[in-house]
């Protein structure tokens, strides 16, 4: 008999003959077709091929994943090496900054300029120490044109340093009310008797004395226009302005007895161009004759802030004062 699940298409039915004539039963033999028998192994082989291909693809994917994992591990190692090198560089830089740390009190932008200024000052001091004062040094004074015969054009007498040796050092040249005697030989070719006349306005009060009162606006308060007209027009204009009206006897005393205003007048008459800027400085520091003789280049450069050229000139004039030599402008 054929099972219900079998199909007539897939089997071959054959009749089996019977030897019993009385029996009406018919027997059939069923056999499967050969085509159906061959189909089942083919299906199994196809499935096995598919599984092999899947295994190969899985193996390939796993191999690629392993390669990617190895590459990531190498990258991690390289990044660790780079990090160690960077940290080493940072530690070295921090150590160098700590060893070369600036002193407390110095700013980063002001430490080097201060050091440079110190070196420049040291060089200036060395230059001044090696500087020699030649005897032939003679400062030049600018000569201004004579415009008119106004009282400001009055000539001043030559400044002679030999006169202070004959003077008495006990007498104060500025506080003395009486004028010192006039030496006509010191005046070139003009008569200055009226210029040094003992007027009450000149020596009687402090407002009339030009040296004692530096705020005097002009010398019109002391001299009249008659004195100005008596001056010869051939005389050049004096470089000293309104503060030059002081008696010669007062300025030719010993330098140690000079007052502050006498020192100021000495600066103006000696070299107005170079030394006049020091007038206010000397007045503020109250530099008198004794202090003037004690001044050195180091004091002028460090404490007074004077330039090197001006300090050299002033020290030269102070040395001439100490030697008692005479130089006329």
Curated annotation (Swiss-Prot):
Per UniProt, the keywords (alphabetical) are: Nucleus, Phosphoprotein, Repressor, Transcription, Transcription regulation
Locate the Phosphoserine modifications and list their residues: 138, 238
Q: A Pfam family matched by this chain, by name?
A: SAM_1
Query: What family does this chain come from, according to its entry?
Result: Belongs to the SCM family.
Top-level taxon? Eukaryota
Q: Quick one: a GO cellular component term?
A: nucleus
What Gene Ontology terms describe what this protein does at the molecular function level? chromatin binding; histone binding
Say what the protein does. Putative Polycomb group (PcG) protein. PcG proteins act by forming multiprotein complexes, which are required to maintain the transcriptionally repressive state of homeotic genes throughout development. May be involved in spermatogenesis during sexual maturation.
Question: What GO biological process, any one, is recorded here?
Answer: negative regulation of DNA-templated transcription
Q: Where is the SAM domain?
A: 258-325
Protein name, UniProt field: Sex comb on midleg-like protein 1
For region Disordered, the annotated ranges are 138-157
* InterPro entries, alphabetized: SAM (IPR001660), SAM/pointed_sf (IPR013761), SAM_Scm-like (IPR047531)
SMART domains recorded for this chain?
A: SAM
**Location in the cell:** Nucleus
């Amino acid at each position: 008999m054929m099972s219900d699940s079998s199909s007539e298409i897939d089997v071959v039915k054959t009749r089996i003959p019977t030897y019993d004539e009385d029996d009406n039963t018919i027997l059939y033999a069923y056999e499967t077709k050969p085509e159906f028998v061959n189909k089942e192994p083919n299906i199994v082989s196809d499935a096995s091929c598919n599984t092999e291909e899947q295994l190969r693809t899985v193996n390939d994917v796993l191999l690629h994943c392993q390669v990617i994992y190895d590459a990531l591990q190498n990258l991690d190692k390289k990044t660790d090496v780079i990090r160690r090198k960077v940290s080493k560089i940072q530690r070295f830089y921090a150590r160098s900054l700590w060893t070369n740390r600036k002193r407390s009190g110095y700013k980063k932008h002001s430490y080097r300029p201060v050091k440079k200024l110190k070196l420049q000052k040291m060089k200036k001091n060395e230059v001044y120490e090696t500087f020699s004062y030649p005897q032939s040094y003679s400062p030049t004074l600018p000569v201004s044109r004579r415009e008119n015969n106004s009282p400001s054009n009055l000539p001043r007498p030559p400044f002679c340093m030999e006169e202070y040796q004959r003077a008495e050092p006990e007498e104060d040249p500025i506080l003395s009310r009486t004028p010192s005697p006039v030496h006509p030989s010191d005046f070139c070719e003009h008569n200055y008797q009226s210029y040094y006349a003992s007027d009450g306005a000149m020596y009687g009060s402090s407002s009339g004395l030009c040296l004692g009162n530096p705020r005097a606006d002009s010398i019109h308060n002391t001299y009249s226009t008659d004195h100005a007209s008596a001056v010869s027009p051939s005389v050049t204009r004096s470089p000293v302005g309104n503060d030059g009206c002081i008696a010669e006897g007062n300025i030719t005393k010993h330098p140690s007895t000079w007052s502050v205003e006498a020192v100021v007048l000495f600066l103006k008459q000696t070299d107005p161009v170079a030394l006049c800027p020091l007038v206010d400085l000397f007045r503020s520091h109250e530099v008198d004759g004794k202090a003037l003789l004690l001044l050195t280049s180091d004091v002028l450069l460090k404490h007074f802030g004077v330039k090197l050229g001006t300090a050299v000139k002033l020290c030269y004039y102070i040395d001439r004062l100490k030697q008692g030599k005479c130089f006329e402008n």
